[in-house]
Design a protein with these regions (language model features):
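Short inter-helical turns and helix N-cap capping residues of alpha-solenoid HEAT/ARM repeat scaffolds
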Residues: 39-40, 71-72, 104-105, 135-136, ...
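Acidic, polar low-complexity linker/tail segments
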Residues: 23, 197-279, 326-328
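Von Willebrand factor
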Residues: 107, 169, 285-294, 298, ...
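Residue-level detector of extended alpha-helical repeat arrays and alpha-solenoid scaffolds
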Residues: 44, 60, 75-76, 109, ...
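Conserved hydrophobic register position within alpha-solenoid helical repeats
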Residues: 47, 79, 112, 143, ...
Length: 443
């Protein structure tokens, strides 16, 4: 199990001291605390399931406090699912509302709302809806996602009312999340509140989101086409985002147009790319992945609107994996110039520390979306040699880092490797994002 963060560790110590758990000896709540003290993952999962089978106030408190504090996805998921099952006990609804509304930490509110999203009870809508206006964006995103997961028509009105408040013209990721949830629940994409209300009055009696079938011909007022610009022809829809760029030495290669190959005399085989500098000692070729990425990033940065806020992470070896800024900064003229200068001065680096890049990206304050560009699988330098980092570990790390942040992670692959493509596709999917292959160059 990962070590506890400082904040989480303090919260857990409070729990383990028993100051807020008036649970009977031998109860599931006490078992959960005991397992947490021992860092026993399987014990915590089993105790969470036991609380769900026999819910009480102490058990609900333990699920929320320990589920938030322990940095382990198995524990988080077990507590989340148990919370959803606890909600089915009508006698605990009042306590549930009390705990959720009284949760000071955004992470605790996110966990509760994530749990509500797993229940099959439409009464959860009234408890979730007020948190669409929570001061913390991660809580708001979690609320949108939970209302969608419930798959009930009662989720629709609070969502379109919130969208009206955020603004139908907003480019923010929250607006995109609202539009997406509404479309999946209703097959509509209206951009005027009056249209939503009129449609709802005529459709609320027959609408059943679980029975909807989606196709490319689905209607609405019009499809949204708002964005901050394009990078590698990929639309950037967020206005508070982190750009992550792979600067590993494999970025030196030149991708060939579809159908063309280059014979590597050293490897004695045809490749879908050309490597004119195997030792990586020369200046990058103008058509290399490295130069193409630099050009694409700089062009995009220069074209950003003043409403955008952004940050940059670059990664190669450990020493070369770094943040340009710790928080997202406004796309002012001076910030854009500084960012372009930073990107233009980059040099490639050995290894591909995807794990560290994700840590840096998820640490950026104020971001709601990550755009992740890479051409290889996770690697690190060990004993002077490059060795693979298990992909499952990296994917699990991203899920853990994102469990309460709720950032959307979009991945883009400059790769001819099916193994790399599969990894990036899974990384994106596990974090609510999309994958796009950007390797192929036009002739």
């Amino acid at each position: 199990m990962r070590a506890l963060s400082t904040t989480a560790g303090v919260a857990l110590l409070v729990v383990l001291a028993g100051s807020s758990l008036a649970a009977a000896k031998g109860s599931p709540a006490k078992a959960l605390v005991k397992a947490a003290k021992k860092r026993d993952t399987s014990g915590m999962v089993a105790a969470a399931e036991a609380i769900a089978d026999k819910p009480d106030k102490a058990g609900l408190k333990a699920l929320i406090q320990i589920g938030t504090a322990i940095e382990n996805m198995d524990v988080y998921t077990a507590c989340q699912n148990a919370i959803g099952r606890v909600f089915s006990d009508a006698s605990l609804r009042g306590e549930f509302a009390k705990q959720l509304k009284g949760a000071k930490r955004p992470a605790s509110r996110v966990l509760c709302i994530d749990g509500l999203g797993t229940t099959d009870n439409k009464d959860a809508v009234s408890l979730i809806a007020p948190f669409l206006a929570d001061k913390n964006k991660s809580v708001r995103i979690s609320s949108i996602q939970a209302l969608l997961k419930l798959q009930v028509k009662e989720s629709v009105p609070p969502l379109f009312e919130r969208l009206s408040t955020v603004g139908f013209e907003s480019k923010d990721a929250e607006a995109e999340e609202l539009f997406g949830a509404l479309f999946k629940l209703s097959k509509q994409s209206f951009e005027v509140l009056a249209d939503w209300k009129n449609w709802w009055e005529t459709s609320k009696g027959t609408l059943d989101p679980k029975k909807l079938r989606h196709s490319g011909s689905d209607g609405g007022t019009r499809q949204r086409n708002k964005n901050e610009g394009k990078i590698f022809e990929s639309v950037v829809r967020s206005q508070a985002f982190v750009l992550v760029l792979d600067i590993s030495s494999s970025m030196r290669v030149i991708d060939l147009p579809m159908g063309e190959t280059w014979y590597d005399k050293k490897k004695k085989k045809d490749l879908k790319y050309k490597d004119p500098d195997p030792k990586g000692t020369k200046s990058p070729h103008k058509n290399s992945r490295f130069r193409r990425a630099q050009d694409a990033f700089c062009k995009f940065i220069e074209g950003m609107s003043g409403r955008a806020r952004f940050a940059i992470v670059v990664f190669g070896d450990k020493k070369d994996t770094k943040l340009w800024k710790k928080d997202v900064v406004p796309a002012t003229k001076s910030n854009k110039k500084a960012a372009v200068d930073f990107v233009r001065k980059l040099k490639w680096s050995p290894a591909t520390r995807t794990d560290l890049a994700l840590e840096r990206a998820f640490s950026v304050k104020g971001a709601d979306t990550i755009y992740f560009f890479s051409d290889g699988i996770p690697e690190k330098i060990k004993g002077g040699k490059t060795v693979d980092i298990p992909q499952d570990e990296v994917i699990e790390k991203a899920r853990l880092l994102n469990r309460t942040r709720k950032l959307r992670l979009n991945c883009y692959g400059m790769t001819s490797s099916n193994k790399t493509r599969s990894f990036l596709e899974k990384l994106a999917k596990e974090n609510g994002g999309e994958y796009k292959d950007i390797r192929v160059r036009k002739k």
